[in-house]
């Protein structure tokens, strides 16, 4: 198993990354979904004890990916935030990330948890529903646009691999759509059938089981 897996989709080369991200080399674009900044803060605000440091860890992972792939842009496919702006811990971590990557263009397609996104002033461009960049349409929830392959998040796909530790995050890869795993490590998951096309993220490596519409390169 490798840390990256390149495959062909609609005539474009895409690269799945073991740290739950997708890279489009032709655009130098890093794509993630479901970052859920502040989720731990929201849980603690509600009286639920969870460890601190999750947001900073996720943003450190993201920073490493931006640098490793020399990305010129970052697209976040929804649920960048997790609910209301209840704490400042995540904000300090985000501001540090943004300062570190000041020239990085960041587009966020708003998700169902992003109600506070517009007033958060995070130095990002917000797309309210989806954005078309042929041959793909980028959205939070899978979008149907004629002639375009949907790339989305929201579902937090996981696949059950008992021999490799049980349920693991995965990319869901079909003829007409790619669903990204949740980038945040602090999320649940929606099961993908073993017979479907997927690329599993297993302990820093990738295990592909491709659908017909995607071809490894």
Regions found by a protein language model. Give the residues of each.
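Extended recognition/assembly regions associated with phosphoester-bond processing machinery
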Residues: 1-217
């Amino acid at each position: 198993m490798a840390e990256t897996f390149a495959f062909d989709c609609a005539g474009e080369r895409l690269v799945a990354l073991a740290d739950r991200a997708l890279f489009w080399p032709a655009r130098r674009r890093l794509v993630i979904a479901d970052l859920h900044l502040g989720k731990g803060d929201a849980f603690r605000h509600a009286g639920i004890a969870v460890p601190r440091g999750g947001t900073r860890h996720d943003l450190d992972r993201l920073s490493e990916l931006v640098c490793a792939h020399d990305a010129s842009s970052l697209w976040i496919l929804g649920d960048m935030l997790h609910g209301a702006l209840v704490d400042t811990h995540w904000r300090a971590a985000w501001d540090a990330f943004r300062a570190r990557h000041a020239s990085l263009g960041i587009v966020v397609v708003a998700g169902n948890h992003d109600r506070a996104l517009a007033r958060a002033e995070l130095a990002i461009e917000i797309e309210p529903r989806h954005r078309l960049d042929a041959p793909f349409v980028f959205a939070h929830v899978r979008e149907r646009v004629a002639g375009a392959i949907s790339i989305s998040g929201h579902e937090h796909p996981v696949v059950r691999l008992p021999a490799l530790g049980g349920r693991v995050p995965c990319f869901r890869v079909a003829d007409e759509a790619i669903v990204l795993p949740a980038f945040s490590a602090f999320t649940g998951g929606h099961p993908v059938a073993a017979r479907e096309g997927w690329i599993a993220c297993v302990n820093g490596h990738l295990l592909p089981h491709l659908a017909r519409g995607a071809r490894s390169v």
